[in-house]
A protein has these predicted regions:
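Catalytic core of pol beta-like nucleotidyltransferases
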Residues: 1-79, 86-201
Length: 201
């Protein structure tokens, strides 16, 4: 499945941004090596003590595209596996492992913003927590012989996960929707003129 085409199709059918995020990230499987993704998801679920369905692949490894600097880029061979763990229990456990007083000043704003949205992004946690997570990523990659870099974020709930994706992808969805609408408007005059009956002189 082409995720860009699917995104355009869902927007054309007037799905809401939330429904699009649910479809693309909860309903459809990832584009790349699903056996490898399965092995990583299974291992992450064992390590974090959650269901395998609580572990979701996101990012360009899932959709085959990334959106940077207002440009949609196709990624046929992504460098990373970005995972989301959607579990209130795991979220609470890892929330309490973070030493808020040790978070670097430059990261505090992002850490607080994400926590209020029901997300833990290890990149903005304290250095010790981040290092432990990076060690874990390396261990999993070595254990399963994975060449791509692995990262994990934690979400309090499925609602927080979808809201986060909508916020992250809002600009992309709006850009694609505008392109669809502009295309429809460009086609409109030709159709209207064609459908007007000729006047007999």
């Amino acid at each position: 499945m082409d995720y860009v085409e699917k995104l355009e199709d869902l927007l054309s059918q007037k799905y809401t941004y939330h429904e699009i995020a649910e479809n693309l990230y909860l309903n459809y499987s990832s584009l790349i090596d699903t056996d490898e993704v399965y092995r990583i998801r299974k291992r992450l679920s064992e390590i974090f003590g959650c269901n395998m369905n609580d572990v979701r692949l996101i990012g360009s490894a899932h959709t085959g595209y990334t959106f940077k600097n207002d440009k949609l880029e196709i990624r046929k061979n992504p460098k990373d596996y970005d995972f989301a763990i959607i579990s209130p229990n795991v979220f609470a456990a890892y929330f309490h492992k973070i030493n808020v007083n040790k978070i670097e000043t430059r990261n505090r704003g992002n850490y607080t913003k994400y926590i209020l949205e029901g997300k833990i992004h290890p990149l903005y946690a304290d250095p010790k927590f981040l290092k432990e997570m990076q060690t874990l990523y390396t261990m999993i990659a070595n254990e399963l012989d994975i060449k791509r870099h692995i990262t994990v974020c934690f979400y309090l709930s499925e609602k927080a996960f979808i809201e986060g994706l909508v916020n992250y992808n809002h600009k992309l969805y709006s850009m694609v929707l505008k392109r669809i609408r502009d295309s429809a408007i460009r086609d409109l005059p030709e159709m209207v003129v064609k459908d007007i009956p000729k006047m007999e002189g």
